[in-house]
């Protein structure tokens, strides 16, 4: 079974020639939406969906505009509105050291330097300067951890475990 990873949401059509407007959540739009790239359009990663091949890609305002081979009019792509775009696992590129895909981080257990479990990462917020990892602490307020060297000490993706240093002021409870 192939694993599929979300790279964007089809928010609307654009024009009448089969172009779709995509709100991307990938750091690699040029790679993901390159001509000839195969994507899955579906409501969820488990859904069967429709495989499409990218014919063209351009940016417009804060959106990526795509056309797909075989889809030449607004009527043919209207049904994709509200769906998500997914890439298969074999299309993921190798990342540099200390770079991770969101799916590798979300769900990891977070422990402090003494090994005390703090919770699990449930979301990642992009701030511009650095990402912020949201830790679900059950019955407590979420802990927001900036992804910076001074806080994140070790990431073990294979064991889904992250060791952190809680700087003064990070945990108000």
UniProtKB/Swiss-Prot annotation:
One of its GO terms (molecular function) is ribosome binding. The gene is rimM. It is found in: Cytoplasm. Residues 97-170 form the PRC barrel domain. It comes from the Bacteria. This is Ribosome maturation factor RimM. The PRC barrel domain binds ribosomal protein uS19. Keywords: Chaperone, Cytoplasm, Ribosome biogenesis, rRNA processing. Belongs to the RimM family. The keyword Cytoplasm applies. The keyword Endoplasmic reticulum does not apply. GO terms for cellular component: cytoplasm; ribosome.
